[in-house]
Amino acid sequence: MKKSLSILALAAVLGACSSVDYDDPGRTETLTIDFGSTDLQNLAGGMVESLISSQGLNYLDSSGKGDDKRIIVYMGGVENRTSEHIDTQGITDKIQNQLLKSGKFRFVAAQAGQDEIGEQVRFQQGSGRVREDMMRSFGKQLGADVVLFGALRSIEKRKGSSIESGGVRKEDVYYQFTLQCVNIDTAEILWMEEEELRKTERTGPFGR
């Protein structure tokens, strides 16, 4: 009986020590040195500001577009060349979202979207369930003017604990994010930007 009460008491104490809170997604994240949400926001934000203000895209041929002369973009990938498992799709999604909101760009669907589009067109044309005058067909998609793609790299350095450092370990990570915008017709690089981050973590003899 006493043992059961002790277990219940311990469970109550442990439960009281845990909590879940909502927080500001834009708050600076400093829990670990690993790539995190703040890094994603900073890198994407810097690229978007640079691309929107670029003068190199003003000379693109806009013939055949009708009244809407905005640049049509295909969002390529960001290659992860770091040692970390980083979902770079989150970076490209963030960039595409902010560029769309700027009102200066149009985007065509990437491969994942093309699969869904193809499936829907085949359904409309072959199922017999869709009105003929509303059926969509292949061959009417917009052609992208440019493609955006890039790479994320990192350089990591570690210094182990020592008597001189008081048992403190130090880790330094440098991130380099490059992105370029290429004219699909000519393969000319119209814009290129680089964003950098450096993070340092010091860990005491008893860990984080």
What are these regions (language model features)?
Residues 78, 151-152:
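Short, well-ordered beta-to-alpha junction loops that form the rim of enzyme active sites
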